[in-house]
């Protein structure tokens, strides 16, 4: 199954986090062309602005007309948003070896098995919210296209899974204009000849559809309809390496947690392509809240990591009276140097 994590109205949401006075107000983040103060386009808008009719891609002059004296207009700060994106991508990368960053505010991961893994999706959502303040929506499906459509259905701040068993019926009832990659113009052209739903293509000659879409997009639609579409998640180079294990029962008993902590350490070091300068112990609590403690040093050898991790675990338990559901270790600031001497 493929999971898409989509950061809800990302640019505007970052602005809300950094200026709480914006919360509840229509917020519009725009790209200014520099020609004049009304020239440019809307990069994104929050849901309050969307309720006014201000949407992404709208010419700025039109958005200013709609939002006059009602909306807050801000210039895009992409480098600032990228810092938030990097933090979120690092969190997501811990949940799969196969991860594809689709854009600054979207990432796909390939999750093992054919079930929806709603628990993992909730965990990812909670970690991102707790560690960055950002709300995300998550879509899950058998391929990237279905995962993306599911994510759209999950917005705002939700989770939607189209299981393998539900895929056939879902595809049979999906509208052409809801399919990623087709676009408004081509959807309109297909609608005009009677193709409103994906299932309608079976009633038309393939060459007729090719005359509208071209060969590549026509093949894409047929593969999707016949449930034969596949596009692999393209992995990226990871910055962090971690392993998380679910405990047999929720507990605060260190003796019961330590064996799983050690397994997490061993697995994380096996994945890491070098020596970490930072180690974090991450505890997912019984209510799915996430608590973590970190240690940074010049070079953290595997033999030393267990004592460091135990100290971090003790800090978590002494400072929090909740039971722990899952325990994990995250290694970061990896040096690919071959020897410890290179650190000094």
Swiss-Prot record:
<keyword id="KW-0460">Magnesium</keyword>
<protein>
    <recommendedName>
        <fullName>DNA polymerase IV</fullName>
        <ecNumber>2.7.7.7</ecNumber>
    </recommendedName>
</protein>
<keyword id="KW-0515">Mutator protein</keyword>
<dbReference type="InterPro" id="IPR024728">
    <property type="entry name" value="PolY_HhH_motif"/>
</dbReference>
<dbReference type="GO" id="GO:0005737">
    <property type="term" value="C:cytoplasm"/>
</dbReference>
<dbReference type="Pfam" id="PF11798">
    <property type="entry name" value="IMS_HHH"/>
</dbReference>
<dbReference type="InterPro" id="IPR050116">
    <property type="entry name" value="DNA_polymerase-Y"/>
</dbReference>
<feature type="binding site">
    <location>
        <position position="6"/>
    </location>
    <ligand>
        <name>Mg(2+)</name>
    </ligand>
</feature>
<dbReference type="GO" id="GO:0003684">
    <property type="term" value="F:damaged DNA binding"/>
</dbReference>
<comment type="subunit">
    <text>Monomer.</text>
</comment>
<dbReference type="InterPro" id="IPR036775">
    <property type="entry name" value="DNA_pol_Y-fam_lit_finger_sf"/>
</dbReference>
<keyword id="KW-0227">DNA damage</keyword>
<keyword id="KW-0808">Transferase</keyword>
<keyword id="KW-0234">DNA repair</keyword>
<keyword id="KW-0235">DNA replication</keyword>
<feature type="site" description="Substrate discrimination">
    <location>
        <position position="11"/>
    </location>
</feature>
<dbReference type="GO" id="GO:0003887">
    <property type="term" value="F:DNA-directed DNA polymerase activity"/>
</dbReference>
<dbReference type="InterPro" id="IPR022880">
    <property type="entry name" value="DNApol_IV"/>
</dbReference>
<dbReference type="GO" id="GO:0006261">
    <property type="term" value="P:DNA-templated DNA replication"/>
</dbReference>
<keyword id="KW-0963">Cytoplasm</keyword>
<feature type="active site">
    <location>
        <position position="106"/>
    </location>
</feature>
<dbReference type="Pfam" id="PF00817">
    <property type="entry name" value="IMS"/>
</dbReference>
<comment type="function">
    <text>Poorly processive, error-prone DNA polymerase involved in untargeted mutagenesis. Copies undamaged DNA at stalled replication forks, which arise in vivo from mismatched or misaligned primer ends. These misaligned primers can be extended by PolIV. Exhibits no 3'-5' exonuclease (proofreading) activity. May be involved in translesional synthesis.</text>
</comment>
<comment type="similarity">
    <text>Belongs to the DNA polymerase type-Y family.</text>
</comment>
<dbReference type="InterPro" id="IPR043502">
    <property type="entry name" value="DNA/RNA_pol_sf"/>
</dbReference>
<dbReference type="InterPro" id="IPR001126">
    <property type="entry name" value="UmuC"/>
</dbReference>
<dbReference type="InterPro" id="IPR043128">
    <property type="entry name" value="Rev_trsase/Diguanyl_cyclase"/>
</dbReference>
<keyword id="KW-0239">DNA-directed DNA polymerase</keyword>
<feature type="domain" description="UmuC">
    <location>
        <begin position="2"/>
        <end position="183"/>
    </location>
</feature>
<keyword id="KW-0479">Metal-binding</keyword>
<feature type="binding site">
    <location>
        <position position="105"/>
    </location>
    <ligand>
        <name>Mg(2+)</name>
    </ligand>
</feature>
<dbReference type="GO" id="GO:0000287">
    <property type="term" value="F:magnesium ion binding"/>
</dbReference>
<dbReference type="GO" id="GO:0042276">
    <property type="term" value="P:error-prone translesion synthesis"/>
</dbReference>
<keyword id="KW-0238">DNA-binding</keyword>
<keyword id="KW-0548">Nucleotidyltransferase</keyword>
């Amino acid at each position: 199954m493929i999971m898409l994590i989509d950061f809800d109205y990302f640019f505007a949401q970052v602005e809300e986090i950094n200026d709480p006075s914006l919360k509840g107000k229509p917020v519009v983040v725009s790209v200014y062309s520099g020609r004049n103060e009304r020239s440019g386009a809307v990069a994104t808008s929050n849901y309050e602005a969307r309720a006014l009719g201000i949407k992404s891609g709208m010419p700025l002059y039109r958005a200013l007309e709609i939002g006059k004296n009602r909306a807050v207009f801000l210039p895009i700060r992409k480098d600032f948003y990228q810092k938030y994106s990097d933090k979120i991508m690092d969190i997501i990368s811990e949940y799969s070896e196969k991860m594809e960053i689709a854009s600054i505010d979207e990432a796909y991961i390939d999750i093992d098995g054919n079930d929806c893994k709603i628990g993992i999706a909730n965990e990812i959502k909670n970690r991102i919210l707790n560690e960055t303040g950002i709300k995300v929506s998550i879509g899950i499906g058998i391929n990237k296209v279905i995962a993306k459509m599911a994510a759209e259905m999950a917005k705002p701040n939700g989770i939607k899974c189209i299981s393998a068993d539900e895929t056939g019926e879902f595809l049979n009832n999906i509208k052409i204009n809801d399919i990623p990659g087709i676009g408004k113009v081509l959807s309109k052209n297909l609608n005009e000849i009677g193709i409103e739903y994906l299932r309608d293509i079976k009633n038309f000659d393939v060459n007729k559809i090719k005359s509208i879409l071209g060969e590549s997009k026509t093949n894409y639609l047929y593969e999707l309809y016949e449930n034969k579409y596949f596009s692999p998640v393209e992995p990226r180079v990871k910055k962090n390496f971690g392993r998380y294990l679910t405990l047999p029962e929720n507990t605060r008993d260190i003796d019961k947690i330590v064996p799983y902590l050690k397994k997490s350490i061993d697995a994380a070091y096996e994945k890491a392509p070098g020596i970490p300068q930072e180690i974090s112990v991450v505890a997912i609590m019984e209510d799915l809240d996430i608590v973590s403690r970190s240690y940074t040093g010049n070079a953290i050898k595997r033999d030393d990591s267990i004592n460091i991790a135990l100290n971090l675990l003790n800090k978590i338990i002494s400072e929090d009276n909740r039971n722990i559901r899952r325990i994990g270790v995250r290694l970061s600031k990896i040096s690919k140097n071959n020897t410890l001497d290179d650190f000094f």
